[in-house]
Amino acid sequence: MSWDYKVSERALKQLKKLDKQAAAQILAYLDERIAGTHDPRQWGKQLKGELNNIWRYRSGDYRILCQLQGEVFVVLVLEVGHRKNMHQ
């Protein structure tokens, strides 16, 4: 079974605030690495502690925070932003 991704309204607003090139880079990353993959965990890192249900992905200088929804094979994009401002 392959995975797909959905972008939350919050993440969509954050994408719109970025310059067009950065937003395109992030969406291209999601299309190339996440959409159609059999295991999105291979591309990211799981956060620790209370946030261990969140995965982070890095696309250039940007981080993408996601929640894996295994029962429907969807990666829900929660937040995007420059990595200096995102959770480690």
Which functions belong to the PLM regions below?
Residues S2-A24, A28, S59-R63, Q67-Q88:
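Enriched for short, Lys/Arg-rich terminal
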Residues E32-R56:
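A short, surface-exposed loop/turn module that caps and links secondary-structure elements
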